[in-house]
UniProtKB/Swiss-Prot annotation:
GO terms for biological process: alanyl-tRNA aminoacylation. Its main location: cytoplasm. Catalyzes the attachment of alanine to tRNA(Ala) in a two-step reaction: alanine is first activated by ATP to form Ala-AMP and then transferred to the acceptor end of tRNA(Ala). Also edits incorrectly charged Ser-tRNA(Ala) and Gly-tRNA(Ala) via its editing domain. This is Alanine--tRNA ligase. Binds 1 zinc ion per subunit. Its EC number is 6.1.1.7.
Amino acid sequence: MKHLTSAEVRQMFLDFFKEKGHAVEPSASLVPHEDPSLLWINSGVATLKKYFDGRVVPENPRIVNAQKSIRTNDIENVGKTARHHTFFEMLGNFSIGDYFKEEAITWAWEFLTSEKWIGFDPELLSVTVHPEDEEAYTLWAEKIGVPEERIIRLEGNFWDIGEGPSGPNTEIFYDRGEKYGNDPSDSELYPGGENDRYLEVWNLVFSEFNHNPDGTYTPLPKKNIDTGMGLERMVSVIQDVSTNFDTDLFMPIIEATERISGDAYGKDAVKDTAFKVIADHIRTVAFAVSDGALPSNEGRGYVLRRLLRRAVRYAKTLGISRPFMYELVPTVAGIMDAFYPEVKEKQEFIAKVIKTEEERFHETLNEGLAILSDVIKKEKEKGSGIISGKDVFKLYDTYGFPVELTEEYAEDEQMTVDHKGFEAEMEKQRERARNARQDVGSMQVQGGALRDITAESTFVGYSAVKAEAKVIELLHDGQLISEAHEGDTVQILLDKTPFYAESGGQIGDRGVLRSEQAVVTIKDVKKAPNGQHVHEGTVDSGTIQKGASVTAEVEDQMRSGVVKNHTATHLLHQALKDVLGTHVNQAGSLVTENRLRFDFSHFGQVTKEELERIEGIVNEKIWESIPVAIDLKPINEAKEMGAMALFGEKYGDIVRVVQVGDYSLELCGGCHVTNTAEIGLFKIVSESGIGAGTRRIEAVTGKGAYQEMNSQLSLLQHAADELKSNVKDVPKRIQSLQAELKEAQRENESLLSKLGNVEAGAILSKVKDIGGVKVLAEKVNAKDMNHLRTMVDDLKAKLGSAVIILGAVQNEKVNLSAGVTKDLIEKGLHAGKMVKQAAEVCGGGGGGRPDMAQAGGKHPEKLEEALASAVDWIKSVL
């Protein structure tokens, strides 16, 4: 067997299947694009669902990829086992209705055993098949020549995710030798059993059935192949190491951690776990941040926060008690640079994000640990082995402890966490709810007439908004029809069209189709699975027929607004990078005729001054009258030019490059102005945060910007009228009114203070003597808690030595304030305990220091009773 690096194995896999006629699908972003069913891309097939379910027909039905993936369902096992990871790479070859079992099995065996490729000894390979999959069994036994004793039938060899495509699978296992298991009595010592000797290196799924809603299975019209090979696992076999962490994918990170910690890997099992956790988690976080995710308290951002804080916790085992994870980013970038250059390109930004998060956690870690230690001690003293949900939530909400981190500390003390209680607290704090994602099926059922339409349709709308065309297909409710009549809702495909189909954030065009017999209003345009533009509309009059000649005309005013807004988003994107930093990336957009919406990654708020600069830059570029050039270029040439790619989009070998002078350069398939002067004016309407690390700007251009500014001027004029002022004097008038208001508030405070003194003086006659101590417990008039506290302070000063508790009713609620002079504290009198006693009577709570405390209550009618209970408490102490 050859010794290969991880980079060589990855490239060898892609090259092998490229030779077999497969198209190499680039690794997609870890952040799913337009797939609400996934938090992360979690497999090689996840990014190909659109091909498997028929929404899009691939140019080549044979696909191969190396896909970065994240799975977080078993984080607690990472570092404690040989092969659990949160970030990993899946190598896979796929067939969308092309080849099937024979080719998949034959090629897998060739790749693994041929000296040209991996070069495994065939005698060390075994396979598993489903008991009823006779075809796969026969192929392994007769075509490949695997001995029957190394073909194991396992009931679990069936891939099924519920409704949708499913089928049997076959797995290939490598025998690592007797040093990993040689006990004849071990019932799990076989390929497919729970053991370390026989390692699964490849899983081939034969998707040949549809799992129907009623639980039955029917054959698929087009059978698919979906295979998966974990790169880390495969490399561990090739490099002959005991765990994935000992491969060249992880060891440079572990070695860097050794240098930081001064500790050694491979000497102590507990410390080895820490090294592994750190190595795994920094890979995940670095790649996720490079793809636009940022630490937060919800969704995927919460996963990153949890991983970083788990790593910090384990780092303490190695004696590391400072931010350090960010120092490992260049190491991760260096390992993966050959295939994933994005981490290296963004390593400064990634390191900054990680360092900021580490510093934030270190600030609260020690305080949080002290609180947790007290909680654990308290529960143990009570004889309890459970940390309450309230305490877990407090640690999460106040100190940033993920519940899983608290759970790990609890396990160290042989305690458990009250998860139900924690979830109940989370429910009360809905704004901190982690994520409520749509429950969307991960695979749709094959089918639909649109998928089978292969007739070509040409888009001519970049240069024209009107064209003569022929109807090549008509559909109603997803079914092909030959004609449609007045009032019918239809989908129409033309041989050529000026109508843009919704994509890249730009909405589909609206307009009209006219034939000699019919008029059809087009309300929207979308792309069919094979790329044609599907015109959705209603027959206004007459009858439209398949084969009819039509004049297709886009609503000119609508398109005019769209192109202005689309080019403006390109200018805005570059302006954001100029002002906020190069880390800014597009995270989504919407371009309509009336306005534009642009979502972008940024981990801080955008200040008013920054927004003004951004808006100013965009308008300067508009007024410079810059020509907009659009060219088709090879993808590599476009990238070398520095063209920005859109978030989540995938591109072919030839791409459309939109260039605004020397200012903006993007890959884009949308419609644009020919010169920035056509945009006229750009005005930001709003800027806000829409999620962890993602901001949104909404803006208008041209006529819309003019109307927006007029609206703002009208509002300003209305304010001036109300203030009885000129528009230009509005700021001065407001400042003058604010000064008058402050003066009135000061006078009000002074009057209230005087009234308070009067009232305080008036109630001095109500002081009681209890056991030689002056006691005053009275209901008073006070506007708020501050006023009440001031009265208590004044009375303490007047009486010299006294216990005072005052109560007031405000807005149907009770305020209580208590004070004890220093000389009486030594006698056991305590303002906090006294006010707590009173508050409980009127349905509230509170407390404070021995000399000063406050509380609140819900039942004003019980205030007198509450004050009486305070007096009783004083008597009990004295």
